[in-house]
Regions:
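Active-site recognition of the HExxH zinc-binding catalytic motif
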Residues: 173-188, 212
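Post-HEXXH active-site segment of zinc metalloproteases
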Residues: 167-170, 188-214
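Active-site-proximal, well-structured secondary-structure segments within enzyme catalytic domains
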Residues: 1-158, 217-266, 270, 281-284, ...
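Short pre-active-site segment immediately N-terminal to the catalytic Zn-binding motif
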Residues: 160-178
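Acidic/polar loop patches that form or flank catalytic/metal-binding clefts of enzymes
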Residues: 88-94, 187, 193-198, 222-228, ...
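Pan-zinc metallopeptidase signature
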Residues: 66, 72-75, 243-336, 344-347
Length: 358
């Protein structure tokens, strides 16, 4: 992005359309609240409950409708198959590998000549002592300096464990999370550099979310869902009418989602442009959001005291990079939409800036 001016230009260009759309969504929810005989004003903590009611009434669709078709096993298979088709690699389960918990699974990643590419680990399930959220970590970065080192990376999530009666069934948002973190994992696994300091996700922040957000497109694709979204009991493919409902509401709640994200991006920049040593956090946030004319019904995705990304998570003054990468991802994925979902030559559009092997 080069400078703050360019970042603000991107955020400002999106802010007004996003908040305009968010206001329409607010009005829809407020109308529903009143229609149900209530007279209170919508608050941020009411949003998800009532927005789901609006979605159900407008599209006859709920994310819970998808869950029986999104078993963890099948969604992971979808991710692996997508990578295999795009990058000519394969994932082989390993029975023995040092690990810090018994739930971790290890996979040897091989190229089409059966040569080792790296090791991919998964730690998918929630447990009492585990940090919340989802992320990718590299235990060994790929490099060629002083001998070849193959990458060892892990995807960590907090999905519910299977029960005696049911496998782990994901919400669609959780399926997207799996693909997102898998994109980060591929960024580390397919790195092709000499020096470890440039390996994997060690790219400019403008690009670091590019491979992860790019991967999300495949799980959103009806073609992939038709192949891998299978009912956990019957094995039947996801019904066409359910897919159509899903496609119709793809942009539902986008005003809200974009507004809360942008508010957090502005907050990040405000903190890292501030020179004062002592500050009242609440007043600082209130002043910023008032200047932006942020709708009171929508909170920032993260408040200052819970904004791990920008204070200890490596995104200091660069939380904007999610949107920056989204712009890149949108342009790059257009090529796949035109030439085919698994068109290998289209990979040139994502390989160069992210230093991936081709």
């Amino acid at each position: 992005a080069e400078n703050k001016k360019n970042v603000l230009e991107l955020l400002d260009n999106v802010w007004e359309p996003a908040t305009n759309r968010a206001q329409e969504e607010i009005d829809e929810i407020q109308n529903l609240i009143q229609k149900e005989g209530n007279n209170f004003k919508l608050k941020p903590w009411d949003w998800w409950y009532y927005s789901e009611k609006v979605r159900k009434s407008k599209f006859d669709y709920s994310e819970e409708d998808m869950r029986p078709y999104l078993s963890l096993e099948n969604i992971q298979k979808a991710a692996f198959t997508t990578a295999e088709r795009l990058f000519d690699i394969k994932f082989k389960a390993m029975k023995k590998f040092p690990k810090y918990h018994e739930e971790i699974k290890a996979y040897k990643v091989l190229d089409n000549n059966n040569k080792i590419v790296g090791i991919f680990l998964t730690d998918y399930f929630a447990r009492p002592s585990k940090q919340g959220g989802a992320w990718m970590t590299s235990y060994q970065d790929q490099s060629k300096n002083k001998g070849i080192k193959h990458p060892i990376v892990i995807n960590v999530c907090n999905f519910p464990k299977p029960t005696k009666d049911k496998p782990t069934l994901l919400s669609f948002e959780q399926a997207i999370t799996l693909f997102h973190e898998f994109g980060h994992g591929l960024h580390g696994l397919l790195s092709n550099v000499t020096y470890p300091s440039l390996s994997g996700t060690s790219v400019p922040r403008d690009y670091v979310e590019f491979p992860s957000q790019m991967m999300e497109n495949w799980i959103r694709s009806p073609k992939v869902l038709k192949e891998f979204a299978l009912h956990y009991e019957t094995g039947k493919k996801i019904p066409q009418d359910l897919l159509k409902k899903y496609e119709k509401c793809q942009k539902f709640n986008q005003g809200f989602a974009t507004t809360e994200y942008l508010a957090a991006s502005y907050l990040d920049l405000a903190w890292h442009s501030n020179n004062r040593k002592i500050i009242d956090i609440n007043k600082f946030e209130q002043k910023l959001f008032k200047s932006l004319k942020k709708p009171n019904e929508i909170d920032s995705r993260y408040g200052s005291t819970y904004f791990n990304h920008i204070f200890s998570g490596g995104y200091s003054s660069s939380y904007y990079s999610y949107m920056w990468s989204e712009v890149l991802d949108s342009s790059a994925f257009e090529v796949f939409e035109k030439k085919g979902l698994f068109h290998k030559l289209s990979l040139i559009h994502i390989s160069e800036p992210t230093r991936l092997r081709r």
